[in-house]
Amino acid sequence: MSILLVTSSPRGAASHSTRIATEFAEKLLAADPSNTLVVRDLVANPLPHIDADYATGIYTPVEARTPRQAEVVGVSDVVLDELFAADTVILATGFINFNISSTLKSWVDHIARSGRSFAYGENGPKGLVTGKKVYIVLASGGIYSEGAAVQFDHAIPYLRGVLGFLGMTDVDVIRIEGVGMGPDAVTAALAKATAKVDAVVASQQAAAAA
């Protein structure tokens, strides 16, 4: 199994989402030595935001692209190749102003590309990125999975929507909630997330042994 880990929190290694997602990937690797891992660290190596050269370059024949168009479209090609090569995708993000990080949004902009990850046909758009299992690891200061605050969670609906549009409909969410509500809340949130990670790993081990 090929695993793609995408981390995006501006807090880097100190981030709860990065920590849990990284531990998740490492446990999957340990569970099966044949598994492989590719890490896309969007903090250490941020992707450029799409611009006019990208917008025109993706519709320009390769041989006719300007050097700048070739550069920015080349970035998109690299992250798309990483995505298509993966069987399992782990996306880690903090909950920033009720949504995903801007670094992760830039990654989404590079993978959501007409002609490569989706195509328009007689019946409308069709996602071309299929057969993937996606896990979203989301850390938030408050609790947004239930109660009145649910209305402020634009991160998970957005990611489910855009990933589904591209063909990735098998999506699970691992939340690390309430980390801004005191040390005890942090401990509880991390324990709950770790338990879910361990359950997923155990399930995959059982399936492989069956």
From Swiss-Prot:
It catalyses: 2 a quinone + NADH + H(+) = 2 a 1,4-benzosemiquinone + NAD(+); N,N-dimethyl-1,4-phenylenediamine + anthranilate + 2 NAD(+) = 2-(4-dimethylaminophenyl)diazenylbenzoate + 2 NADH + 2 H(+). It comes from the Bacteria. InterPro entries: Flavodoxin_fold, Flavoprotein-like_sf, FMN-dep_NADH:Q_OxRdtase_AzoR1, NADH:quinone_OxRdtase_FMN_depd. FMN binds at S9, S15, H16, S17. SUPFAM superfamilies: Flavoproteins. One of its GO terms (molecular function) is oxidoreductase activity, acting on NAD(P)H as acceptor. The keyword DNA-binding does not apply. Keywords: Flavoprotein, FMN, NAD, Oxidoreductase. It is an enzyme of class 1 (oxidoreductase). Its EC number is 1.6.5.-, 1.7.1.17. Binds 1 FMN per subunit. Its cofactor is FMN. Quinone reductase that provides resistance to thiol-specific stress caused by electrophilic quinones. Also exhibits azoreductase activity. Catalyzes the reductive cleavage of the azo bond in aromatic azo compounds to the corresponding amines. Belongs to the azoreductase type 1 family. Homodimer. This is FMN-dependent NADH:quinone oxidoreductase. It comes from Mesorhizobium japonicum (strain LMG 29417 / CECT 9101 / MAFF 303099). The lineage of its organism: Bacteria, Pseudomonadati, Pseudomonadota, Alphaproteobacteria, Hyphomicrobiales.
